[in-house]
Regions:
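Bacterial Sec-dependent N-terminal signal peptides
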Residues: 1-22
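N-terminal mature-domain "stem" immediately C-terminal to a signal peptide or N-terminal signal-anchor/transmembrane
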Residues: 20-100, 263
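Long, mid-chain structured domain cores
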Residues: 69-164
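Active-site scaffold of zinc-dependent metalloenzymes
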Residues: 101-112, 190-220
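Sec-exported extracytoplasmic/periplasmic mature domains
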Residues: 130, 166, 170, 231-236
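Auxiliary, metal-adjacent structural segments of Zn-dependent hydrolase domains
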Residues: 142-201
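Active-site recognition of the HExxH zinc-binding catalytic motif
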Residues: 220-244
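Post-HEXXH active-site segment of zinc metalloproteases
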Residues: 237-261
Length: 263
């Protein structure tokens, strides 16, 4: 009887821990997404957010020639800053007392960022943030963000379970802190990212785009997207190791043979 009660208690604690994961809106994710949209990055220009997309265009269109936007376009051309690299920067930013600052390990900013003067980038980003009155825009849409997050938590979060990641990839329990952020400018773009703050568990992010079908007016609630994006934080480091290249090629070829008829 005692063992049964302990088992039930453990199950309840596990469910409670999983229930603590809630979707979020992030000012830095919106900042990088809207900067990318203003710079004409096609992956952030889907405009699948209905009135929010219209509000974004009305507010930021006048800043398409802003010095930071011009500089950012150059970074894309020279360093390939796009897609998940935008998101990787976003999760390594925080806003404190009205200023954007870098946090975490700068060595985690790869994929082109390692060739960028990060202090200079943040300085330019702060100018865009101030000149566009970005915080004012973000706060004006706080109710919109929160209303959607409630819907997302109802429709998606009951299906999100993260305890298996550590067991599957490391053979141990998951110590990571999993977070789901909605990118309201991302549309059909979805990315995974991670960061390690000093003295904190590894934070694993799934940044999922707000996707409103323009034909039906229905919101997309895809329960598989966060799970897919979380995987990147575990799979990508394995792929980057040279000693794994041959093994992955062999497995990839076998998997392709099994699935090529459906592709």
């Amino acid at each position: 009887m005692k063992q049964t009660l302990l088992t039930i208690l453990f199950a309840l604690l596990t469910i409670s821990a999983m229930a603590q994961i809630k979707s979020e809106a992030s000012e830095t994710v919106e900042l990088m997404g809207i900067l990318s949209r203003t710079a004409g990055f096609q992956e952030f220009s889907n405009d699948l957010a209905g009135q929010y997309s219209k509000d974004t265009e009305a507010w930021f269109a006048q800043y398409r020639e802003h010095p930071t936007v011009t500089y950012y376009k150059e970074l894309r051309a020279k360093n390939g800053i796009a897609y998940d690299r935008v998101t990787n920067m976003a999760v390594h930013l925080e806003i404190e007392k009205g200023k954007v600052k870098l946090v975490g390990n700068r060595a985690e900013l790869t994929g082109g960022w390692q060739n960028v003067d990060l202090d200079d980038f943040v300085k330019r980003l702060n100018k865009f943030y101030a000149d566009t009155r970005f915080h004012e825009f973000f706060e004006q849409h706080r109710t919109f963000y929160n209303d959607f997050l409630k819907q997302y938590d109802t429709n998606v979060m009951p299906y999100i379970h993260t305890d298996w990641y550590g067991k599957f990839y490391n053979g141990t329990g998951s110590d990571e802190h999993f977070r789901i952020i909605i990118g309201f400018t991302y549309g059909s773009t979805n990315n995974g990212a991670s960061r390690q703050l000093p003295g904190q568990p590894l934070e694993v992010f799934a940044v999922c785009g707000y996707n409103l079908n323009p034909q039906t007016g229905r919101l997309l609630f895809d329960t598989s997207l966060p799970l897919h994006e979380f995987n990147h934080s575990f799979v990508n480091p394995l792929m980057e190791k040279a000693e794994n290249e041959k093994a992955m090629q062999e497995v990839g070829q076998r998997l392709f043979q099994l699935s090529q008829s459906a592709m």
